[in-house]
């Protein structure tokens, strides 16, 4: 069975756990409608992605 050779310092333990924290999701503003949406995702209200119509808007 594998056993650690040295004790893990609090600094190293904290550096390892730093990736476990919850991060606030990023949002970008749609230049056409001004609505917020996730980057690299389709804007669900307008159905646009990178200037192209991908989905039909919900209002139609």
UniProtKB/Swiss-Prot annotation:
Domain of life: Bacteria
InterPro entries (alphabetical): Ribosomal_bL32 (IPR002677), Ribosomal_bL32_bact (IPR044957), Ribosomal_zn-bd (IPR011332)
UniProt KW keywords: Ribonucleoprotein, Ribosomal protein
GO biological process: translation
UniProt key word Ubl conjugation: no
Any one Gene Ontology molecular-function term assigned to this protein's record: structural constituent of ribosome
Compositionally biased tracts (Basic and acidic residues): 34-44
CC terms in the record's Gene Ontology section: large ribosomal subunit
Chain intervals with Basic residues compositional bias: 1-16
Gene3D superfamilies: Single helix bin (1.20.5.640)
Keyword Ribonucleoprotein applies: yes
Region: Disordered, residue numbers: 1-60
Pfam families for the chain: Ribosomal_L32p
NCBIfam families associated with the record: rpmF_bact (TIGR01031)
PANTHER family given in the database record: 50S RIBOSOMAL PROTEIN L32, LARGE RIBOSOMAL SUBUNIT PROTEIN BL32
Similarity comment text for this entry: Belongs to the bacterial ribosomal protein bL32 family.
This protein's name: Large ribosomal subunit protein bL32
Organism of this sequence: Parvibaculum lavamentivorans (strain DS-1 / DSM 13023 / NCIMB 13966)
């Amino acid at each position: 069975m594998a056993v650690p050779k040295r004790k893990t310092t609090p600094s190293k333990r904290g550096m390892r756990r730093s990736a476990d924290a919850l991060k606030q999701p990023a949002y970008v503003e749609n230049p056409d409608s001004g609505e917020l949406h996730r980057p690299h995702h389709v804007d669900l209200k307008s159905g646009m992605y990178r200037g192209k119509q991908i989905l039909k808007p919900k209002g139609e």
